[in-house]
């Protein structure tokens, strides 16, 4: 974590910014959702997991007049609380086998965190299931990947990469993580405004830009967008695509955290290869709506920016509040008929999973929003929902990923779905 927070034994604690509070809250809450998702089977008694904090810092901050736990302590505490609940509610108990890697390039940070963990009662676990590494994340990563692979075949792992800027984590390294493990997820902080301000032909061949695989032509193409209407949105949109393509992530959730302290925006990018992981992160943004924004529209294809359109129409900053929910539901209701009709013309219907998976990356829409609107269209007689076994679901509120959306044989004269 370069440039903002510093720790040293005997020195005052760094002051935690409001945007970092939001990130830490997301980290802790997502851990809880993640574990709950993977332990839904009542007979399950064990889960293997590795949690990696690639820019751990010293583990303690000051906010106002109080000490505040940093990400290492919050991650440890979240796992402990979840294991206690699982052990108390499962007849045969539960063993949550979580290993932790806390990595930082600054020796003072490592010494500070080690001291904090000892004071908090974790001394016996250091070197057993809590591993502290004094190294750059990229240097420590090969050993971490080897550890995860040895731990089991599922290779479930969460990488929290809370870098201060935008170039400390090479995109090739994220590509390696996502490509070499079976079930990894990456949460990456990315200082997009700082990158946009840095972009110029003069800086085109710096190592920082090479780390995120932007070459001279890429930089030139991005800087050429400057000056036109909505240029910042255009550059952000191009960077979305670039990061997804370079990391190989099938699913990503790009949302903004605004830093009042620096007056700049950061991305919190969730990268994974699993549809369910993406959906859960999207739902979490709706629940923790105080600090998060999405720059774009309300429905599907919300990040596909058209420079010919008036920026004031549909491209306003999107907050995760009640008004945003209403806008999302209205937009999805407007877009779904065309999407379903086109799929039915090409084939025998559209799987709910295919509909969501092929459209979820560029949208704040979650499966809950989608299912509510599908049920509405069905109840209006605009579509039929068919279960995997071929039976109809005329009234069921449970719309599954394997259900198929088909046009009914008869529709109203004013059908939204057309012919």
Report the location of each language-model feature.
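A conserved mid-domain beta-alpha-beta active-site/ligand-binding segment of alpha/beta enzyme cores
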Residues: 204-260
């Amino acid at each position: 974590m370069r440039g903002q927070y510093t720790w040293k034994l005997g020195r005052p604690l760094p002051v935690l910014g409001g945007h970092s509070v939001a990130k830490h809250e997301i980290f802790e809450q997502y851990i809880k959702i993640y574990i709950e998702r993977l332990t839904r089977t009542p007979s399950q008694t064990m889960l293997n997991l590795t949690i990696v904090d690639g820019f751990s810092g010293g583990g303690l901050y000051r906010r106002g007049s109080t000490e505040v736990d940093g990400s290492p302590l919050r991650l440890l505490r979240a796992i402990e609380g979840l294991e206690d609940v699982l052990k108390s509610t499962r007849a045969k108990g539960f063993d949550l086998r979580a290993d932790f890697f806390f990595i930082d390039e600054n020796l003072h940070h490592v010494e500070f965190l080690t001291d904090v963990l000892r004071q908090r009662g974790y001394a016996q676990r250091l070197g057993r299931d809590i591993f502290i590494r004094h190294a750059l994340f990229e240097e420590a990563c090969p050993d971490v990947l080897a550890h995860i692979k040895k731990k089991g075949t599922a290779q479930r792992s969460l990488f929290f990469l809370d870098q201060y800027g935008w170039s400390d984590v090479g995109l090739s390294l994220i590509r390696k993580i996502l490509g070499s493990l079976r079930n990894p997820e990456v949460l990456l902080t990315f200082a997009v405004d700082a990158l946009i301000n840095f972009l110029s032909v003069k800086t085109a061949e710096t190592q920082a830009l090479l780390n995120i695989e932007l070459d001279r032509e890429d930089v030139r193409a991005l800087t050429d967008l400057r000056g036109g209407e909505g240029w910042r949105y255009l550059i952000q949109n191009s960077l979305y695509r670039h990061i997804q393509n370079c990391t190989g992530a099938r699913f990503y959730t790009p949302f903004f955290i605004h830093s009042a302290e620096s007056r700049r925006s950061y991305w919190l990018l969730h990268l994974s290869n699993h549809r369910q992981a993406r959906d859960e992160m999207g739902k979490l943004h709706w629940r923790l709506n105080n600090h998060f924004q999405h720059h774009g529209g309300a429905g599907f294809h919300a990040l596909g920016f058209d420079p010919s359109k008036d920026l004031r129409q549909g491209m306003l900053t999107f907050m995760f509040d009640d008004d945003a929910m209403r806008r999302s539901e209205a937009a999805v209701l407007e877009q779904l008929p065309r999407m379903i009709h086109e799929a039915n013309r090409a084939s025998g219907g559209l799987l709910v999973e295919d509909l969501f998976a092929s459209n979820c990356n560029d949208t704040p829409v979650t499966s809950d929003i989608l299912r509510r609107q599908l049920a509405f269209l069905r109840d209006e007689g605009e579509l039929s929902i068919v279960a995997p076994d071929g039976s109809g679901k005329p009234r069921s509120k449970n719309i599954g990923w394997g259900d198929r959306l088909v046009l009914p044989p008869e529709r109203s004269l004013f059908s939204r779905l057309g012919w």
